[in-house]
Regions:
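Catalytic machinery of carbohydrate-active enzymes
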Residues: 1-208
């Protein structure tokens, strides 16, 4: 909550306490109704007990495309993130000074909410520093570190979306983690790597 208000102060952020399930939908809906909002849009692609999968585009779009269609917003606006956030150069510099010790370095982010991606690390030069993005600080604190990297290696996460939406770097590597509906649409060039840790069930099409 704190980092959201710090970097997107134009949004009225409403905290909701996590519980056994109602916080996903019922409580947020009630809070918004109490604020007498003119329009309430639920951007969940799927949620138990809710008919979101009945939308005609559900079976044919990725999760991020689904949200933009639902909201009636052009999908290309996904890459206008820079216009929507306020960067904090002091926090970014502090993170840079804390983690960067070699001018030649690669930034990695391999941990997702439910899995850790793998890759052949021999592609990284031995004299380069490897900087894994951690939960330290705000996610936006890492922007200067990422911008200074000679290579970026990431899996399906908020960080890879951030890099793509802000078009950071040119030598970018993406490690897939989910099936096509839960994989984000990227607008910039990435080299895709095999993920030895991927769940085989996420593969929709298989060769015999």
């Amino acid at each position: 909550m704190e980092q959201l208000t710090h970097h997107a102060p134009w949004v009225k952020w409403i905290p909701v306490q996590a519980d056994s399930g109602a916080f996903f939908y019922n409580i947020p809906l009630e809070r918004l109704q109490n604020f007498k909002c003119d329009e309430i849009l639920c951007l969940y692609q799927s949620l138990s007990g809710q008919p979101f999968d009945k939308e005609p585009y559900f079976q044919h779009t990725s999760f991020d495309q689904y949200k933009y269609i639902k909201a009636g917003v052009p999908f290309l606006n996904k890459w206008k993130l820079a216009e929507c956030i306020v960067r904090d150069s002091d926090r970014e510099q502090a993170m840079y000074d804390k983690v960067v010790t070699n001018e030649h370095y690669v930034v990695t982010h391999l941990n997702a909410s439910h899995s850790t991606a793998g890759f052949d690390s021999s592609i990284i030069p031995e004299d380069w520093q490897i900087i894994p993005i951690t939960s330290d600080g705000y996610i936006f604190d890492w922007l200067k570190v990422i911008e200074g990297a000679e290579s970026i290696i990431m899996t399906d996460s908020v960080m890879s979306n951030l890099v793509d939406q802000l078009n950071i770097g040119t030598d970018r590597y993406y490690i897939p983690l989910n099936h096509i509906q839960l994989t984000p649409v990227f607008g910039n060039d990435w080299t895709w790597l095999d993920n030895p840790n991927i769940n085989p069930n996420v593969k929709i099409f298989r060769s015999s």
